[in-house]
Amino acid sequence: MWGLLTIYWKQLHRFNPFELIAWRVAMSAAVMVGVVTIWRRWSLLTSGLRASGVRHRVVLAALAVLVNWTVYVWAVVHGHVLETALGYFIAPLSTIAVGVLVVGESLTPARRVAVVLGVIAVIILGLSVGRVPWVALAIAVSWTSYGFLKRTIPLSAVDGMAAEVFFLLTPAVIVIGAMSGAADSVVGAASVGQIVLISMAGFATVIPLTMFSYAAQRVPMTVLAPTQYVVPSINFLLGWLAYHEPLNTSRIVGFAMIWIALALITAETIVRSPAFERRRPGGTPG
């Protein structure tokens, strides 16, 4: 479902991406009000936010996801779908870098090779277009930052997301109000069908994220880890086959190097998993 969001936002390409993000935040906040009310989590949410340092981390997480959403939607409506795919492919490598530089984790040989391949791939892709692939890097860094910050926030997935969109709601309403007077704004120019699409932005945001959070708590990591490549793979195919974005030799080489790096990480994750160890001769039975 997450991978289909590219098609969703592409249908709204005529509107300013900053206005679209403001509506996304507003609609997500409306959905989360309903979710928190139905699940009776207001007291848990407010008590969780009173804990030391939580509000500051929620604000930082909200800003990180705001950057991610904004760059992603801007790129989709301006014809840079392939670069969004690259960004989400790079994100696992960016996560490894954060683990080493911030958390102090050590790099295995396979991950060293993967990181080097990722860096070379970004350089090749940058040279192929004559500029730094800032869309891909911004998406990767913002998504990695968001994931890192979420690990430090002692709130459930539902409470955390609610707190984030509630924090972003006031700026979003200001943006909507400031831009609604323009002739090409959502208020001034949207058709009935486009209004319906925009009104669904909250569900399009909340449902995939909730499903992912649910799976993350119940599905083994060896099964869950490869699924993070599904969304960028869908975006890659959409950008190439549906939206006919250029895929020259340099881009093919760059993407191929990223895929090899991710294959190394995935293979290592599977081989090091307890389930795999139990299947090996001499492994501890479950």
Question: Which sequence ranges carry the predicted segments?
Answer:
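Hydrophobic alpha-helical transmembrane segments of multi-pass membrane transport proteins
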Residues: 1-4, 8, 59-76, 138-149, ...
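Glycine-/small-residue-enriched transmembrane alpha-helix faces in small-molecule transporters
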Residues: 1-22, 120-152, 174, 238, ...
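C-terminal transmembrane-helix exit sites in multi-pass transporters
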Residues: 74, 91-110, 233-252
